[in-house]
């Protein structure tokens, strides 16, 4: 069975995602669509609108066949680490191709940028750092350096828009890991990532949809019908994360002091002082981010740092986990066609597939050996995923008392597509 891989967050699943899913199947000639999806905390440094099981349910009801979770260290990471972790998951599953959306829609142009960054990576990093010290923003600085090295006009390089940036990192990850997956890209339809407008076909950005939900507006026309029901249920039960709760939990962590903060991932010299100063007076989450942000770090970078603080992510451990890559595959759900694919691909799967968390410790021990470094890292990676679920539950105003160790009780979803 030919399978196409999708790298996703589905925050939430909307009409643009449905277009991407259908166009990806067609472009790759695939019978099965396999999504690797972020868990409770996302690449831009924020909690997901819905928990990972509800987002997996939306995806499966809308036609995705397999949903596996991208472990926390990669889901809440910079674009290169996010891309590499996701590509490694799909490759380990035995997926044939990868199809991603981009503003450019030009695979050749994206591949040329990926090649330039691979061949001139050190030069790009050094010269970009110089421009950052002069006060230029990161995206503009990197575009200018790449333009100088390639001899192209910076405006013609697809290095500004967020989906192009991720697409380039997916292509770099395919090269770096030696993956045989064939890449495809399709043009993103509708509004841009930061755009609140609604485009043709009732396609809006996920961020625009979240803003509408926060203002109490209806978004039914922007979502496929099966996703409408899931979002409506979570909204009625007050199960969207609350920014005030997030802010208070972060303050409790920051008040542990600068020595503690300096032990965490990406809390660099100077940021710890800004965090403690901001925590003393900030009134909400957005004010905290604004007070800490400096020109050389993007807002997204600061938000990710705050998610590391919330989840107590130690610097030395995170570096080791990112270097190791994903060490297991957590199945969130599948369709009958997806289960057939997983069964057929079992022998060529290169990472242990976790379907029952109560047996994962013995499963990892058998795979890696009880005294191996990979076993130690796999347990640490698992602990971060479990911690993310516990902490996410603390952000939900309507939490009903269900166990915060929900990872141990939720079996993989078994869902037929509803459309």
From Swiss-Prot:
Keyword flag Cytoplasm: yes
- Which BP terms in the Gene Ontology apply to this protein? tRNA modification
Q: Which UniProt keywords apply?
A: ATP-binding, Cytoplasm, Ligase, Nucleotide-binding, RNA-binding, tRNA processing, tRNA-binding
Its subcellular locations are: Cytoplasm
Q: Which GO terms describe its cellular component?
A: cytoplasm
Q: Which catalytic reaction applies to this protein?
A: cytidine(34) in elongator tRNA(Met) + acetate + ATP = N(4)-acetylcytidine(34) in elongator tRNA(Met) + AMP + diphosphate
Q: What class of enzyme is it?
A: ligase
Residues bound to ATP: 7-20, 101, 163, 188
Q: What is its EC number?
A: 6.3.4.-
Recall the GO molecular function terms of this protein's record: ATP binding; ligase activity, forming carbon-nitrogen bonds; tRNA binding
InterPro entries per record: Rossmann-like_a/b/a_fold, tRNA(Met)_cyd_acetate_ligase
Q: What does this protein do?
A: Catalyzes the formation of N(4)-acetylcytidine (ac(4)C) at the wobble position of elongator tRNA(Met), using acetate and ATP as substrates. First activates an acetate ion to form acetyladenylate (Ac-AMP) and then transfers the acetyl group to tRNA to form ac(4)C34.
Question: In which family does this protein belong, per the annotation?
Answer: Belongs to the TmcAL family.
Q: Which NCBIfam families match?
A: PRK13670.1
HAMAP family with a match to the protein in the record = TmcAL (MF_01539)
The name this protein carries in UniProt is tRNA(Met) cytidine acetate ligase
Organism the protein comes from? Syntrophotalea carbinolica (strain DSM 2380 / NBRC 103641 / GraBd1)
Which gene is this protein's source? Answer: tmcAL
């Amino acid at each position: 069975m030919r399978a196409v891989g999708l790298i996703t967050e589905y925050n939430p699943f909307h009409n643009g995602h449905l277009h991407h899913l259908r166009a990806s199947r067609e472009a790759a000639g695939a019978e099965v669509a396999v999504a690797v999806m972020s868990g409770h905390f996302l690449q831009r440094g924020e909690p997901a609108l819905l928990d990972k099981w509800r987002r997996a349910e939306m995806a499966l009801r809308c036609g995705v066949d397999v949903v596996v979770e991208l472990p926390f260290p990669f889901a809440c990471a910079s674009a290169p680490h996010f891309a590499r972790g996701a590509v490694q998951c799909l490759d380990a599953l035995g997926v044939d191709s990868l199809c991603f959306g981009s503003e450019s829609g030009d695979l050749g142009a994206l591949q040329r940028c990926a090649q330039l960054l691979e061949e001139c990576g050190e030069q790009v990093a050094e010269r970009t750092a110089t421009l950052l010290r002069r006060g230029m923003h990161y995206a503009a600085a990197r575009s200018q350096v790449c333009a100088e090295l390639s001899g192209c006009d910076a405006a013609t390089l697809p290095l500004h828009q967020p989906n192009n940036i991720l697409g380039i990192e997916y292509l770099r990850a395919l090269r770096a890991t030696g993956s045989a997956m064939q890449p495809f890209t399709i043009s993103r339809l509708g509004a841009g990532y930061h755009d609140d407008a609604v485009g043709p076909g009732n396609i809006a950005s996920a961020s625009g949809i979240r803003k509408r939900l926060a203002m109490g507006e209806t978004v039914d026309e922007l979502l496929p019908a099966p996703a409408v029901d899931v979002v409506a249920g979570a909204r009625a039960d007050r199960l969207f994360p609350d920014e005030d709760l997030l802010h208070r939990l972060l303050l409790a962590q920051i008040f542990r002091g600068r020595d503690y903060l300096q032990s965490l991932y990406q809390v660099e010299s100077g940021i710890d002082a800004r965090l403690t100063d901001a925590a003393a007076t900030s009134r909400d989450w957005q004010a905290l981010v604004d007070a800490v942000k400096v020109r050389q770090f993007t807002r997204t970078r600061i938000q990710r740092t705050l998610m590391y603080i919330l989840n107590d992510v130690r610097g030395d451990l995170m570096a080791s986990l990112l270097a190791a890559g994903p060490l297991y595959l957590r199945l969130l759900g599948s369709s009958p066609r997806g289960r057939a694919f997983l069964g057929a691909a079992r022998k060529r799967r290169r990472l242990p597939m976790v379907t029952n968390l109560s047996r994962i410790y013995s499963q990892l021990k058998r795979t890696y050996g009880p005294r191996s470094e990979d076993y130690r890292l796999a347990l640490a990676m698992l602990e971060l995923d479990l911690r993310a679920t516990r902490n996410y539950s603390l952000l939900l105003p309507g939490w009903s008392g269900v166990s915060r160790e929900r990872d141990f009780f939720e079996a993989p979803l078994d869902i037929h597509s509803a459309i």
